[in-house]
Amino acid sequence: MGALTKAEMAERLYEELGLNKREAKELVELFFEEIRQALELNEQVKLSGFGNFDLRDKRQRPGRNPKTGEEIPITARRVVTFRPGQKLKARVEAYAGTKS
């Protein structure tokens, strides 16, 4: 199974919408930049029919160095989480067990 890249997304925009390649690449970059900026501003990103990107604060917790077994603290941090929407879940589940 391969991975969808930003370059492939831009190529699809070029082919499907007739944008030139530079415009298609800029559109993809702008889309992701908008998501990044919203998250930087502590905003939730809701993409209808796809899912939500949220920020979650994780508290400091104890961890362990796997090599030495030494206990070390894992610092508090903020993480981005993604929760798929119902439509996305349904489409993924419809293809469960099929090979591409």
Curated annotation (Swiss-Prot):
Which domain of life, per UniProt?
A: Bacteria
Q: What is this protein called?
A: Integration host factor subunit alpha
Q: What does this protein do?
A: This protein is one of the two subunits of integration host factor, a specific DNA-binding protein that functions in genetic recombination as well as in transcriptional and translational control.
Record has Transcription regulation as a keyword: yes
Q: Quick one: a GO biological-process term for this protein? A: DNA recombination
Q: Listed disulfide bonds for this chain? A: none
Q: Which family does it belong to?
A: Belongs to the bacterial histone-like protein family.
Q: Which NCBIfam families has this protein been placed in?
A: himA (TIGR00987), PRK00285.1 (NF001401)
Q: Which gene encodes it?
A: ihfA
* Source organism (scientific name): Ectopseudomonas mendocina (strain ymp)
Q: Which InterPro entries match?
A: Hist_DNA-bd (IPR000119), Histone-like_DNA-bd_CS (IPR020816), IHF-like_DNA-bd_dom_sf (IPR010992), IHF_alpha (IPR005684)
Note the Pfam families from the entry: Bac_DNA_binding (PF00216)
Q: Source organism lineage?
A: Bacteria, Pseudomonadati, Pseudomonadota, Gammaproteobacteria, Pseudomonadales
Keyword tags: DNA recombination, DNA-binding, Transcription, Transcription regulation, Translation regulation
Report the GO terms under cellular component: cytosol
Does the record's keyword annotation contain DNA-binding?
Answer: yes
**Entries under SMART domains matching the protein:** BHL
GO molecular function terms listed in the Swiss-Prot or TrEMBL record:
DNA binding; structural constituent of chromatin
User: What subunit structure does UniProt give?
Assistant: Heterodimer of an alpha and a beta chain.
